[in-house]
């Protein structure tokens, strides 16, 4: 029988606020029935006799939230990354994405591919929660949901909706996309463990008005959130406006169907080029933006993350696999820092060698990966009292350092130089789902 009350001992690192990273050297983090009871130098009297997992000198961090990832694209990660301009992204879809995603009509193929995706996410990443795009195939989407649930992960998974502008036969009729989505919601509304459905129109150009209207109504009827893509590229924005003459901004194309936070929670990936109206919609509707620094940089674009955070827009991080070459949110953090500095240098510095930097640092990026995305799931993303207990143990020993260093320096090296072996253990909602030294916990 699993323990419901226990403690982890180690170097505890978290960011309850955007500005500051807190360090607790070899202290105790107590889990009490799936939530954090707090961090203590010594165990309080009521917890004196609980089990302690001793991770002395190892790092204990909150589980991270991948707010935008395409599970069926994992099989061709690292391919098609040399495209030279935005117009070639259509080639990327035609050559890589749509042909691969169309294969998931075969449940055996989906089972094999999703087994690898889930195994790698559990065992090699800091991710404990994710918002995941599947494909248009209902049965394959349920295969993915079950595998994630069986592994103990927490996630929202979306069956894609695409009833126009696709390729290779990878498209539903409008009637199919509506009926299959309703059937999928009926079959998954109670979830697979901690894995639940989320309405997922791929983006406006691939969804007719009829399907968008139906999806918006189903989101309310089944009380499930919505996720999609928004304002990723300038050509995409112009395409949307040419299709919908009655909108002022791209965001209106979702908002007119209740899918931009007016009726249910909404998550939008990228948002690199929001105009003033779209910006206010995001802010006032509490829409969460999934910042995907790798894929945006691949298109020569950088999201205005600092502006968003300072103005009160919610922001988390996404890998956007296969837009990023792997599932590592630690890499997403470092890239978010790099591109933030580049944006500041090119748009705000004004050739002033003494200009004050206004760009992301490690604490900020860590917050986005934990608390930033975690708020979409509830009280998730730090170790303050009553937050859900998601924790990942990181082991520095595998980096084979030749000298002793302060633990803060070791942590930086983990962030920038980690390997799959860096992940020692993982806990989700109080349940340990992975231990590197044990073959199976589920």
Predicted regions mapped to residue ranges:
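His/Asp/Glu-enriched, well-ordered alpha-helical/loop segment
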Residues: 11, 252, 256-262, 305-400
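C-terminal cap of metal-dependent C-N hydrolases
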Residues: 17, 388-442
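N-terminal metal-binding scaffold of metallo-dependent hydrolase/deaminase domains
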Residues: 1-47, 58-59
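Alpha-helical scaffold segments that flank or form the walls of functional sites
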Residues: 30, 78-153, 177-191
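Active-site gating loops and adjacent loop-to-helix segments of metal-dependent hydrolytic enzymes
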Residues: 75-110, 164-174, 233-263, 336-359
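Divalent metal-coordination and catalytic microenvironments
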Residues: 11, 29, 34, 57, ...
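Metal-coordinating catalytic core of metallo-dependent amide/deamination hydrolases
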Residues: 139-272
């Amino acid at each position: 029988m699993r323990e419901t009350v226990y403690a982890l001992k180690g170097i505890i690192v978290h960011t309850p606020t955007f500005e500051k990273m807190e360090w607790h050297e070899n202290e105790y983090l107590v889990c009490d029935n799936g939530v954090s009871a707090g961090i203590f130098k010594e165990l309080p009297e009521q917890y004196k006799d609980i089990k302690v997992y001793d991770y002395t000198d190892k790092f204990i961090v909150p589980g991270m939230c991948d707010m935008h990832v395409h599970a069926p694209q994992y099989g061709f990660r690292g391919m098609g990354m040399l495209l030279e301009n935005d117009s070639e992204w259509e080639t990327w879809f035609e050559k890589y994405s749509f042909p691969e995603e169309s294969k998931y009509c075969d449940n055996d193929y989906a089972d094999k591919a999703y087994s690898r995706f889930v195994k790698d996410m559990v065992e090699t990443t800091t991710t404990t929660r994710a918002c995941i795009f599947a494909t248009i195939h209902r049965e394959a989407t349920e295969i993915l949901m079950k595998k994630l649930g069986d592994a103990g992960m927490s996630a929202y998974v979306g069956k894609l909706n695409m009833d126009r502008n696709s390729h290779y036969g990878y498209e539903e009729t409008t009637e199919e996309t509506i009926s299959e989505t309703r059937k999928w919601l009926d079959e998954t509304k109670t979830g697979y463990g901690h894995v639940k459905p989320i309405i997922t129109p791929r983006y406006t150009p691939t969804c007719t008005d009829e399907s968008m209207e139906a999806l918006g109504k189903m989101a309310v009827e089944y009380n499930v959130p919505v996720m999609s893509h928004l304002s990723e590229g300038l050509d995409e924005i112009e395409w949307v406006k040419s299709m919908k003459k009655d909108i002022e901004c791209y965001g209106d194309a979702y908002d007119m169907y209740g899918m931009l936070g007016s009726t249910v929670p909404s998550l939008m990936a990228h948002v690199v080029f929001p105009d003033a109206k779209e910006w206010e919609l995001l802010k006032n509707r509490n829409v969460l933006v999934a910042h995907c620094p790798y894929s945006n940089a691949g298109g020569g674009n950088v999201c205005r993350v600092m502006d968003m955070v300072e103005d009160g827009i919610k922001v988390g991080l996404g890998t956007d696999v296969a837009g990023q070459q792997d599932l590592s949110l630690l890499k997403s953090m470092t890239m978010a820092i790099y591109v933030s500095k580049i944006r500041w240098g090119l748009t705000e510095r004004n050739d002033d060698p003494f200009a004050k930097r206004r760009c992301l640092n490690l604490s900020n990026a860590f917050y986005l990966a934990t608390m930033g995305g975690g708020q979409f799931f509830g009280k998730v993303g730090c170790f303050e009292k009553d937050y859900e207990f998601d924790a990942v143990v990181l082991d520095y020993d595998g980096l084979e350092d030749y000298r002793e260093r302060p633990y803060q320096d070791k942590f930086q090296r983990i962030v920038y130089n980690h390997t799959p072996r860096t992940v020692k253990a993982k806990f989700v909602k109080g349940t340990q789902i992975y231990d590197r030294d044990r073959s199976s916990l589920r």
